[in-house]
Amino acid sequence: MNEAIIQLDHIDITFRQKKRVIEAVKDVTVHINQGDIYGIVGYSGAGKSTLVRVINLLQAPTNGKITVDGDVTFDQGKIQLSADALRQKRRDIGMIFQHFNLMAQKTAKENVAFALRHSSLSKTEKEHKVIELLELVGLSERADNYPAQLSGGQKQRVAIARALANDPKILISDEATSALDPKTTKQILALLQELNCKLGLTIVMITHEMQIVKDICNRVAVMQNGVLIEEGSVLDIFSNPKEALTQEFITTATGIDEALEKINQQDIVKHLPANALLAQLKYAGTSTDEPLLNSIYRQFEVTANILYGNIEILDHIPVGDMIVVLEGQAENILAAEKALHEAGVDVSILKRGA
């Protein structure tokens, strides 16, 4: 089991503006393990970016304790490292942002080299390092191009290479794909996953999009109004969300809310027979391998009309979501529901026949 590389314990962040007191983060505890791709999700103003800025002490908390890679960096209201030690700790943490922050008058390789200006490497070693980094992010052929000659995705690749220049153990991505189109977003996420595997890089993803969490993260924390309201593995959160906001994020990411709107307009649902019901089935892991609907027909003579179906792979585990009309004798439907529950399927009744 991997050890925690980032420990944020009981973090409070309060801002004072004249007579106003703004509690941006309230008593948040988050532990992120070495090698995690950890998502922190929430709407604008949730406090997620403010929270993550305390990892490298770009933002000092009001209260709480911060431990990064075994070193306590903040405790008892003050920074625990010397100025030199803090600078070194910050070199272990790379950051990428929504806006690429590249220098327009410098080429791609010069932008990456800029991050090495305080490195102890020789000039030749720096040149080799820059070439290696651009190859790592798949941009070696664009080394001599200026930012104006690059697409949004290519600019973000340069920014990632620059963030990796000092061999960080942690990479923080603050809405880094928000300005990109869907295809480019997928390419950047695939690159981050590759870097996570190849370098053992711990990645912290700040986002307002649960789709990104679903695509890349293994754990997720959900924030609302400065409070951490839910945290766990992506599989657990997606298959069994407890908070209303989490459920809202997930229905948006899976598209099931749009599917339900269309399903409710279908005649079969509008005029549901007395011996039928509309149900949502959620299942994970080995349950996705079983022909369960076929089984309940054979055992209980309950038919299932599939109106919507979707299977996602979350952290290498299949998770399914299905909306069906179950039809049969009332006692048989009850028996079928019980059998589905026993097989590990969560059954939610959306509508009963009149």
Swiss-Prot record:
Keyword Nucleus in record: no
Domain ABC transporter positions: 8-250
Catalytically driven reaction(s): L-methionine(out) + ATP + H2O = L-methionine(in) + ADP + phosphate + H(+); D-methionine(out) + ATP + H2O = D-methionine(in) + ADP + phosphate + H(+)
Subcellular location(s) of the protein: Cell membrane
PROSITE patterns in the cross-refs: ABC_TRANSPORTER_1, ABC_TRANSPORTER_2, METN
Bilayer topology: Peripheral membrane protein
One GO cellular component, as annotated: plasma membrane
UniProt family annotation: Belongs to the ABC transporter superfamily. Methionine importer (TC 3.A.1.24) family.
Subunit record text: The complex is composed of two ATP-binding proteins (MetN), two transmembrane proteins (MetI) and a solute-binding protein (MetQ).
Protein name: Methionine import ATP-binding protein MetN
Gene expressing this chain: metN
